Amino acid sequence: MSKVLFIKASPLPNEVSRSSQVAETFMEEYKAKNPSDTVEELVLYNTEVPLLDLELMTAGRELQAGKAFTDLAPEVQQRLNAYNALTDQFLAADKYVFVFPLWNLGIPPLLKAYVDTFVIAGKSFRYTEHGPEALLKDKKAILIHGSGGIYSAGQTSSFTHGEPYLRTILQFIGIEVAPTIFVEGIDHNPSKEAEIVAAAKAVAHESVAEF
């Protein structure tokens, strides 16, 4: 039995977000084929995702120096608890499904803040004399990525830092990343929206078998 963490990184409701619609299709198919697995849904825009800032970095250094957690300011304790809860939740999962849009050639800022909660030296990777070593080597992920333009291939593929970044950072910590499901090009061809979404859903159905 596997534990699946379904991470939604769009503030838009499902009826508006085409990538979320495709992700729901993927999850429905996955649950049907893997009834014994457990699925936990994490909606980032409905979740407190603490930003890794000076306050948290200072608190981390103080704790490493021996300061008691209870001696931190109450609001700092609360932020650290929220941060650590996200870390623990991520590390406890076996599989990850990320659905996210392309914003200005990158990922949403809240998704980047979330990435910082689990890419942590000593937890998801470690430094050795031979370089960094991944610690999450028996886990899998799949990315479902929406964009108004087409960035998965062609001349514009070199412009985007969204899907390549998330894929690379997950591989860096040892996670095997399946081929991405792209939901793209609707802003270029609005009249083909239904066709594009249907094609992406077909890929989603096929992708479940290998996940």
Where in this protein do the model-derived segments appear?
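N-terminal beta1-alpha1-beta2 submodule of the flavodoxin-like/Rossmannoid cofactor-binding fold
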Residues: 1-100, 105-109, 113-116, 120, ...
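Residues at the starts of beta-strands that form the adenosine-phosphate
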Residues: 3, 38, 139-141, 177
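Cofactor-binding loop segments of dinucleotide-utilizing enzymes, especially the Rossmann-like FAD-
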Residues: 9, 146, 183
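Glycine-rich phosphate/pyrophosphate-binding loop and the adjoining helix
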Residues: 28, 153-211
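Short, well-ordered alpha-helix to beta-strand connector turns
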Residues: 93-94, 138, 175
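Short, acidic/small-residue loops that bind anionic groups at enzyme active sites
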Residues: 118-132
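Short, glycine-/small-residue-rich phosphate/pyrophosphate-handling segment
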Residues: 128-172
